[in-house]
Amino acid sequence: MPNHLPSLALVALAILPGPAFALEDSYLPADKIPYAVEAPGQPQRLGPLWGERAKGPAGTLLKVPGNWRAPVHAHTADYRAIVIKGLWAHWQMQGGEATKVELPPGSYWTQKANEMHDDACLSDTECVILLINDTP
């Protein structure tokens, strides 16, 4: 399986706001990312890469098992996302009809705050998504 992380890291750097680069050099090997359960009883896990998503600008990896689907939901902040691993689907609920878009690794989407949407991992194996937010 090809490693998309180097090219996706360049994409992430290209879309990050300028102030995010005022950091010291830091490294976080993939096997050291401190994943935590997002919600009790749910399988999705969050791995913080930089910042704190509950406080401000942040980059976070989301891991979900294969064939997982979220309920229709909304977030309190805008976010950008890049598919790292697996086949992802994202639905917009605008106009009362959902429009599903399938997103393979390397794909990108944005989501506005307070807009209802749905997400799913269509792969049989886990999906990994890079979530980037500027506000909590």
Ranges and model annotations:
Residues 65-66, 75-95:
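Glycine- and acidic-residue-biased ligand/ion/polar-headgroup-sensing regions
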Residues 48, 59-63, 80, 100, ...:
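Conserved hydrophobic/aromatic beta-strand scaffold that supports enzyme active sites
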Residues 8-17:
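Bacterial N-terminal signal peptides
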